[in-house]
Regions:
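Solvent-exposed interaction patches of small proteins and small membrane subunits
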Residues: 1-131
Length: 131
């Protein structure tokens, strides 16, 4: 989570503000986009693996994929936002091909949607660990 947060903060600083107009995303350098997308990909991988481990610990199995883990996490209340399912689609899209327009759109969604979802998920997991 920390590395994704650092990447998001670098981009926000480069653009000079937290709320971006639509064209601002196109001004982000390709290197920053690629870096943020990579950090998003492995943060997503870690997140769904933690979901899977928690679900298996709770006796829920078999969990075979990120889609299974995410669906179960929604079902048991580990996460509460269905945009996690969209996250899987974007993660698969960025892993399979690189397209500048797609990258720009995914970066926008990472900054506006997915990063906050990861932070909320981290809080949930930390709360579960304390209890």
């Amino acid at each position: 989570m920390r590395l994704l947060t650092e990447g998001a903060e670098i981009i926000i600083q480069e653009l000079g503000k937290a709320e971006f107009e639509e064209t601002a995303y196109e001004r982000i350098s390709d290197l920053l986009k690629e870096g943020l997308i990579k950090r998003f990909e492995y943060t997503h991988q870690l997140a769904w693996n933690v979901m899977k481990d928690y679900e298996e610990y709770q006796g829920i199995s078999p969990i075979m994929s990120s889609r299974d883990a995410t669906h179960q996490a929604l079902k048991i209340g580990l996460i509460d936002d269905t945009r996690w399912m969209n996250m899987i689609d974007n993660r698969n899209l960025t892993a399979d091909t690189y397209n500048e327009n797609t990258a720009t759109q995914v970066v926008k969604e990472i900054l506006q949607i997915y990063h906050p979802l990861f932070l909320k998920y981290e809080e949930t997991i930390n709360r579960l660990l304390i209890n």
